[in-house]
């Protein structure tokens, strides 16, 4: 599927305001522009910023000859409890604020201009014991494809063994057909698929991904007129009486627990800021990162791959002190929202 970034053309305003929103470029941290007061409900945990709810808007234009194509919106991170509206209809609700999610646009689109609105909540203070930011703080993109295409997230790569070096590449498609796969240094292979096919590949003289040398391979998958490109490292992980092992070798974890904010940029997920963060940690002697206290961005995971830094993904931790935050607890768990 083809990814089109939707980073420009947005406006943002407080939910309920009647004045036009101000133009913003994504990723955008709306909380960063709010006043800081001693009476802020979040207090020291959120830097004394006040909390508000926000409404983002932009136009999504779809040519008539592409209306029958697949259109899927991806939001990499919206803080929090996002509502997505297309042409006045509620297309999705996403509780939590740190996981990416997808919205199938098919039932709501029309040829020509479409009104896209996203509501992000943050007035329910206090809702965090760290600076969360607010709004569309990670990238948004539109995935499109014709009838025959590789499914979104339809390429999965797994290291089976190191001696011999074998990887398993699983490809899922929207229809039967021929799948072509190319991995650098290996001959091109093709297989007929009924919608899902597996390519077991042996890599001679494989270059392993290690904490000293982050060797990465590039995999290109083609199906009909569609294409997907993924990178992967040859590595195995384990845990036993000798502790953590990587590629069968014991590794002493020298890790840091880092939050998703980027200092003066607030919660904005800027690729250069993320790269700088990982680079500085590696230069200081760290070899691992744990995302605190929630799933991190795709940008951070990719940078860890490039910088030979192991990564541990936190799922969720909420609360404003040592006790669970009743607002988030009720929304996510009692209400069955999940994460």
For the regions a protein language model found, what residue spans apply to each?
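Active-site-adjacent substrate/metal-binding segments within catalytic domains
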Residues: 35-62, 66-74, 79-85, 92-95, ...
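Short strand-coil-strand connectors
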Residues: 15, 76, 87, 182-186, ...
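Extended acidic/polar, glycine-enriched regions
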Residues: 109-111, 170-240
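Contiguous beta-strand segments within globular domains
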Residues: 159-170
């Amino acid at each position: 599927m083809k990814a089109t970034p939707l980073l420009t053309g947005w406006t943002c305003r407080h939910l309920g305001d009647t004045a036009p929103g101000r133009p913003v470029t994504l990723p955008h941290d709306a909380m960063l522009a709010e006043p800081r007061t001693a009476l802020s409900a979040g207090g020291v945990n959120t830097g004394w910023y006040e909390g508000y709810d926000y409404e983002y808007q932009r136009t999504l234009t779809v040519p008539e000859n592409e209306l029958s194509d697949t259109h899927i919106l991806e939001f990499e991170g919206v803080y929090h409890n996002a509502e997505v509206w297309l042409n006045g209809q509620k297309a999705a609700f996403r509780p939590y604020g740190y996981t990416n999610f997808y919205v199938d646009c098919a039932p709501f689109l029309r040829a020509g201009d479409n009104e896209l609105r996203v509501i992000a909540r943050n007035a329910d203070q206090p809702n965090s014991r760290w600076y969360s930011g607010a709004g569309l703080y990670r990238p948004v993109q539109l995935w499109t494809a014709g009838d025959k295409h590789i499914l979104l997230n339809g390429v999965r790569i797994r290291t089976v063994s190191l001696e011999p070096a074998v990887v398993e590449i699983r490809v899922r498609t929207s229809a039967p057909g021929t799948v072509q796969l190319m991995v650098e240094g290996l001959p091109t292979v093709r297989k007929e698929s009924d919608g899902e096919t597996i390519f077991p590949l042996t890599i001679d003289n494989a270059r392993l991904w290690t904490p000293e040398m982050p060797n990465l391979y590039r995999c290109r998958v083609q199906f009909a007129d569609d294409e997907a490109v993924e990178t992967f490292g040859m590595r195995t992980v384990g845990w036993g009486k000798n502790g953590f092992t990587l590629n069968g070798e014991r590794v002493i974890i020298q890790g840091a627990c880092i939050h998703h904010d980027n200092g003066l940029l607030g919660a904005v997920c800027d690729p250069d800021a993320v790269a700088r963060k990982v680079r500085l940690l590696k230069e200081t002697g760290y070899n691992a990162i744990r995302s605190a206290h929630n799933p991190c961005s795709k940008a951070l995971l990719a940078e860890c791959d490039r910088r030979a830094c192991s990564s541990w993904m936190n799922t969720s931790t909420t609360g404003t002190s040592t006790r669970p935050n009743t607002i988030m607890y009720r929304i996510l768990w009692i209400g069955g929202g999940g994460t």
